[in-house]
């Protein structure tokens, strides 16, 4: 009995000693997420283990950052505005699958010579909220397998693939974008992509789509017919430089909250038609360069445009050399302060319909190189500012109403007058082209 009691006491004290002992062993085995650069500097490996001290080469904790110019970037990455011209390979070790990062922003930003990312299936993104700038400038990548990415909690995908011009394809069919609010410049500069299937993208919460497809010159088609843009406020440069697009279906676009549309289609010279008849532009303030260089367009229906809040229209149609006529009779330009070069180099344009004269403080070269333009007066290369934006004394052509059109008959010859009030004899069909007063209304005779 005594021996048994002694045994129990010994076990009791042993247990107490174990419980009170410093947790040195546990501390030594604590895992951490870190990035290690190989001795030759060309490979970055992501680990989540307790072996950091044994790794050769420099290493950084996964949450270590450096700040420059107010911008924080991962400690292992290059300066946010510089380039990493050393790293050719990135590897995610199998141990990393147990780690749950909350951000992958700028992880490989400007890794311009990166050729391969291995083990991406070990990157668990289920808790990631920010993927902005993740692969920005990775121009050396020719393929990218993101099939294991869980994006259900991501809110920011801006600049995510920007500058990845080496990619020829990108499979994002499994991406869950229901919580994403920022997609600006997401694919900008991906000039190697020839197709992009975004048919499953949920964009109901996106507010910014500016530069989203900027300079995606390799795309020849883009189906956005399912896009929900009800909350988008910024569409500037959205398709700018998409010179390969021959058609673009934007019939699903709700633009009621958009305030910026400048450069939206600039450089889309492959487009031959563009249906914007449903566009609501009541809140848009900037439209400069909107159709700049769209030389393939032969017609453009802007009848739905509400321009009452627009302040800038300079270069809006500049370089639209395929247009022969343009109806802007519904344009309200009372708040526009800049119209310079608005129709510059619209070399095939013969008619601009508008029933009102425009005024604007900045309007030099507004009609420069519009040599075919015919309005109330003949085109004069020395008169190309806003003073010629007039249906009575300039290059504008008044648009007759339906009521006026039905009255243009021989029986109404006695009701036709010149703008100076002189009565015109003869039938309407035999009169020379010009602006007349018919039954008390200004009417154009083409």
Q: Language-model features: where?
A:
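N-terminal secretory signal peptides that target proteins for export/translocation
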Residues: 1-7
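Negatively charged
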Residues: 26-400
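Short, isolated positions in well-ordered beta-strands
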Residues: 53, 424, 443-444
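Glycine-centered tight-turn motifs at strand-turn-strand junctions
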Residues: 423-430
């Amino acid at each position: 009995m005594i021996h048994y009691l002694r045994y129990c006491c010994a076990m009791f004290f042993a247990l107490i000693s174990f419980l009170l002992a410093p947790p040195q062993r546990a501390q030594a085995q604590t895992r951490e997420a870190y990035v290690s650069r190989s001795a030759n500097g060309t490979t970055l490996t992501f680990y989540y283990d307790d072996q950091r001290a044994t790794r050769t080469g420099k290493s950084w904790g996964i949450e270590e950052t450096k700040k420059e110019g107010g911008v924080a970037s991962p400690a292992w990455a290059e300066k946010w505005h510089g380039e990493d011209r050393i790293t050719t390979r990135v590897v995610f070790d199998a141990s990393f699958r147990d780690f749950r990062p909350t951000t992958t922003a700028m992880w490989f930003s400007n890794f311009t010579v990166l050729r391969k990312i291995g083990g991406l299936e070990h990157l668990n993104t289920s808790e990631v909220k920010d993927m902005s700038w993740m692969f920005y400038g990775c121009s050396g990548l020719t393929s990218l397998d993101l099939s294991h990415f869980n994006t259900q909690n991501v809110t920011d995908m801006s600049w995510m693939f920007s500058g990845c011009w080496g990619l020829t394809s990108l499979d994002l069919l499994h991406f869950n974008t229901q919580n994403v609010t920022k997609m600006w410049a997401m694919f900008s500069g991906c000039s190697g992509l020839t197709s992009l299937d975004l048919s499953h993208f949920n964009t109901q919460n996106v507010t910014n789509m500016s530069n989203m497809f900027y300079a995606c010159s390799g795309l020849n088609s883009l189906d956005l017919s399912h896009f929900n843009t009800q909350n988008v406020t910024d569409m500037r440069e959205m398709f700018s430089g998409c010179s390969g697009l021959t058609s673009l279906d934007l019939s699903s676009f709700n633009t009621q909250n958009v305030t910026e549309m400048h450069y939206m289609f600039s450089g889309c010279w492959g487009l031959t038609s563009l249906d914007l008849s449903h566009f609501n532009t009541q809140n848009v303030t900037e439209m400069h360069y909107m159709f700049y260089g769209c030389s393939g367009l032969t017609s453009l229906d802007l009848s739905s445009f509400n321009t009452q809040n627009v302040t800038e229209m300079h270069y809006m149609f500049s370089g639209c050399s395929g247009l022969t006529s343009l109806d802007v009779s519904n344009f309200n330009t009372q708040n526009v302060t800049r119209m310079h070069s608005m129709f510059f180099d619209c070399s095939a344009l013969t008619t601009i319909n508008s029933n009102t004269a425009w005024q604007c403080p900045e309007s030099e070269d507004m009609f420069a190189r519009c040599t075919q333009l015919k309005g109330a007066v003949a085109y004069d290369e020395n008169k190309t500012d806003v003073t010629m934006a007039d249906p009575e004394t300039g290059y504008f052509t008044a648009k007759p109403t339906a009521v006026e059109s039905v009255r243009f008959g021989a029986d109404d010859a006695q009701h036709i007058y010149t703008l100076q009030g002189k009565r015109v004899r003869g039938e309407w069909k035999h009169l020379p082209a010009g602006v007349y007063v018919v039954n008390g209304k200004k009417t154009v005779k083409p």
